[in-house]
Regions:
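Non-catalytic interaction/Regulatory regions outside core domains
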Residues: 1-88
Length: 88
C-alpha cells in the first residue's frame, strides 16, 4: 500500500485513523524526536505490546493500540504514511 502523495504530519495521522482499527493514540515526530502532530505523551514511547513505532530518516510515527488492532495491517499503513511524510 502506498499513498503516492505528500502528507503533512496531521494529514498522516488523519489518514491512518481512516484505515486502522483500534488506534488509541498516535504521534508524528521529526528525526530529533520533536512532536509534529498528535499526542505528545508518545514522544518517548518505545515499541511494546500496545505500542508500534515506524521510523524513516526524517520521521517517526508512534501509535498506541487497543486489543483489536490488526497489527500486521497497521504496520503496512505506518510504512505508507511514512512514505507520504517523506515525500513532502
Amino acid at each position: 500500500m502506498t499513498t503516492r502523495s505528500a502528507l503533512t504530519p496531521a494529514g498522516a495521522l488523519g489518514w491512518l485513523a481512516t484505515l486502522s482499527i483500534d488506534v488509541r493514540a498516535a504521534a508524528v515526530l521529526d528525526a530529533a524526536g520533536t512532536v509534529l502532530a498528535g499526542d505528545p505523551a508518545l514522544a518517548g514511547a518505545g515499541e511494546g505490546p500496545d505500542v508500534m513505532v515506524a521510523r524513516s530518516e526524517r520521521h517517526a510515527i508512534v501509535v498506541r493500540t487497543g486489543p483489536r488492532a490488526l497489527k500486521h495491517l497497521l504496520r503496512a499503513d505506518l510504512r505508507a504514511a511514512l512514505e507520504g511524510l517523506d515525500i513532502a
